[in-house]
From Swiss-Prot:
Protein name in UniProt: E3 ubiquitin-protein ligase ZNRF2
Gene Ontology terms: cellular component: cell projection; cytoplasm; cytoplasmic vesicle membrane; cytosol; endosome membrane; fibrillar center; intracellular membrane-bounded organelle; lysosomal membrane
Annotated keywords: Cell membrane, Cell projection, Cytoplasm, Endosome, Lipoprotein, Lysosome, Membrane, Metal-binding, Myristate, Phosphoprotein, Synapse, Transferase, Ubl conjugation pathway, Zinc, Zinc-finger
Native source organism of the sequence: Homo sapiens (Human)
Top-level EC class: transferase
Name of the coding gene: ZNRF2
Zn finger (RING-type) location: 199-240
Reactions the enzyme catalyzes: S-ubiquitinyl-[E2 ubiquitin-conjugating enzyme]-L-cysteine + [acceptor protein]-L-lysine = [E2 ubiquitin-conjugating enzyme]-L-cysteine + N(6)-ubiquitinyl-[acceptor protein]-L-lysine
GO terms for MF: ubiquitin protein ligase activity; zinc ion binding
Pfam families listed in its UniProt record: zf-RING_2
Amino acid sequence: MGAKQSGPAAANGRTRAYSGSDLPSSSSGGANGTAGGGGGARAAAAGRFPAQVPSAHQPSASGGAAAAAAAPAAPAAPRSRSLGGAVGSVASGARAAQSPFSIPNSSSGPYGSQDSVHSSPEDGGGGRDRPVGGSPGGPRLVIGSLPAHLSPHMFGGFKCPVCSKFVSSDEMDLHLVMCLTKPRITYNEDVLSKDAGECAICLEELQQGDTIARLPCLCIYHKGCIDEWFEVNRSCPEHPSD
């Protein structure tokens, strides 16, 4: 009997220590007090040993942990929106700063943008005839447009392609007419009887037995050399002024 009576007392002692709200009321009967004491003991044991709680309640705890982990991520959207607004304001400020320095349209000038695109330093702006400085006048002479011997106004003269002489621009027309209409020099064909030095055209030795051409100025050359020379020139290689 003593052991049976000590059981509820010990349970009531534990109930008072851990959970006072689970004690039965003073107006309850003895049987109800005993049942209440047993329920309080079970509640105290459940609070003291949480590992004995059924597994059906565990998903709710994990769901609560997931909700708690997801809760701090909510303010990220306003922060991203605030960053986007800052970037947009910076970009609009940059556009506003660049607006006073807009480049004018190159096609609004006297010469369109097509000329500037297709022009180069060599052709002098597309090779078009434009007045110098925008003033009315004749076509502009571009450097490199003509060979050196055909640009008399730039070099003060030209080299005659016939006689290889430099002639002033004032005498250019007359000199060309004279060179082109001048009769071809005739020569006497002969056989060299002895060595006579070197040929001024091919720079080879004139040896005995070679067929030579003797010009009116008494200059002698290889016949083949002087024939090739006369195909381009109409004067003696050593006396171009004659």
